[in-house]
Each structure stands twice: as structure tokens, then as C-alpha cells.
Amino acid sequence: MPSVSDTDTSLRFPILIGDIGGTNARFSIVLDANSEPTEPQIVQTANFNTIDEAIQAAVLDRSSVRPNSAVLAVAGPVDGDEIELTNCPWVVKPRQMFANLGLSDIVVLNDFEAQALAVVALGEEHMEKIGGGTPEPNAGRVVLGPGTGLGVAGLVYALRHWIPVPGEGGHMDIGPRTPRDFEVFPHIEKLEGRISGEQILCGRGLVNVYRAVAKADGKPAPFTTPAEITGAALAKTDPVAEEALETFVTCLGRTAGDLALVFMSRGGVFLTGGIAQKIVPALKEGNFRAAFEDKAPHSALMRTMPVYVITHPLAALLGLAAYARNPSLFGVQTAGRRWQA
């Protein structure tokens, strides 16, 4: 198991930072406490058998800089010396990385912990507001993002630190509510008999919803990718795609509202990832905000909570960089998640 004091937060520069999702992995290097991350290297996880191979090819083989430490954010729970990713066959093995990559200190976080850190690191110029009032500066926040899966993390301020709260909230149940939902939901692909957030609120989830809408109405479903469905829906050229995206947006609003209540997110709710960035028009024009606020008896409270879409394409890397430069600013618990050679 990891062996390092949780109170010893400092890391030796240069520091490799990596945001490892189910489909893509993004890497950069923070040279010192005052520098911005180097030009990011982005790879598809399917192109490499292991994360070690990806780091070697994308970072080490392209730079003369040799990192001493690494801060990695992975899509999945961090547990034990071999960390499996939820939507990717890679297994992160920090002790093996010492030998293979020459690192001496590795911290592994949840990918949406990094997104939560990014909320603190980014300015409002990298955010698009979707209704609500003015955020309270030190109030609770929540981050969620549909991508390969559905990531969720809370963010709370306590003892003068921002503390990310990682979890697997993307696997919460989602159920039908309206009469139309009850027509469509029986056709949504289930996972071991249940419909969780990741069966709807991610790329493949949008495809699931699109096919379910088509089946419910006995119509053809020629599109096979989230990009095709989103493009047709936003262009208003395919009614099935339009309804699928509207259902997606509505379910996202309901789920975001539920999570906002859990974390009492008067500091804001933040949507992140490529899907959220691409569907901003649908989020603004559709039922997202109404679904978000429809939480009786707390609808008035919900109307005050602002929602933002994070528009920076590499937000998680910036969050990791902020942490790498000065870990003591954040209340990140590294016990059980930090390895030293």
C-alpha cells in the first residue's frame, strides 16, 4: 500500500500531470511552482496497451525534461496498488511506474476531483452561465460531466481549504417521471436490470436514448454516434434526434438538481466535458433549467443556484496543475492514494 505521511504535501518538480479518461488521456508537465503546464499531449487510450507506454511515447520520448513526481487523475475509484479504470482497460500501477518511468512520487486522484479543482483554478471567462443567481463565494459546489461515462464530484470549503469530494455519483438510478418517459424508458438499454446515470447521461447514453425514442414510436434510427445525433438535433433536421437530445437535457437537469440539493450548491453547479460544451444551445433553450429547478418543496432555492458550463477544453489539467504547484492550498486527502519510491 502507499507509504507517505498525509501531512507532507509537497511534491518535487518537475511534475507530470495527467487526466486519464475512458477515451482520451491528456498529459503535461509543471516545471516549477510559478510555471504554467507545458503544451499538453493528448492520446487515445485505445492506441496503447498501458498507461506507462502512453506516457513514454507521448511525454518522455518528446521531451528532455524528466519528471520526478506525477499527479494523475483517473476515471474510476482509487483503491489499492492496482487501480482499474471504469471505461478503459488500462490499470494504473504506481510502483511499476517507478521502475518504468523513473518517477519517485505519485499521487492518483479521481478524474472528477481534478474537475472540482479546476472550478477553483478557472476564471469566469472559461464558463458559460445557464441561469440562476449570483454564487456565494465559499458555498458548496458540485461538478458533473457527461463524457465516456458520467463523472460527479462535490467541492466544499472548510478550514480555509477547498476540499474536493470524489465519488461514483454517475451510477445513481434514473427513473421515468412524465407519461412520455414511461413510453421511452422501457426501451433504454439496462445494466443488470437497472438504468443508472451512465445509461443515459454520457455519449453511449445519448445513443441509448435515441434508439429508445425511435423504438417507442416505431421509427428508424439511422444515426450511430453521439456526434451524429447531436448534430441533427441542433440543426433540427431529425425529430427523433431532437427528442433524444431534449430527453438527455431534461435528465441532466434533474440529476444536476438532485446533486445540487445533496451539496447545497449555492456556490454553483458546474457542467464539464466535451458533450456539455457542444450542447450549450440546447441547455439554454430546452428544459434543462426547468428540470433543474423542479424540486418541490425547494424550487425557490433551486432558482437561486447558478449553473455553469466549463468551456475550457483542458480544465482538469489546469486543476491538477494548480494542485501540483501548491498542494497545501487544497484539502486533498492523499492517504492511500500516494506512493513514494
UniProtKB/Swiss-Prot annotation:
The UniProt keyword set, sorted, is: ATP-binding, Cytoplasm, Glycolysis, Kinase, Nucleotide-binding, Transferase
Q: Which domain of life is it from?
A: Bacteria
Q: Which CDD domains match?
A: ASKHA_NBD_GLK
| Enzyme Commission no | 2.7.1.2
Pfam families in the cross-refs: Glucokinase (PF02685)
**Transmembrane intervals:** none
Principal localization reads cytoplasm
Q: Which GO terms describe its molecular function?
A: ATP binding; D-glucose binding; glucokinase activity
Report residues binding ATP: 18-23
Give compartment(s).
Cytoplasm
HAMAP family, sorted: Glucokinase
Which family would the database say this protein is a member of? Belongs to the bacterial glucokinase family.
Please identify the protein, giving its name as recorded. Answer: Glucokinase
Q: Which organism is it from?
A: Mesorhizobium japonicum (strain LMG 29417 / CECT 9101 / MAFF 303099) (Mesorhizobium loti (strain MAFF 303099))
Q: List the top taxonomic levels of the source.
A: Bacteria, Pseudomonadati, Pseudomonadota, Alphaproteobacteria, Hyphomicrobiales
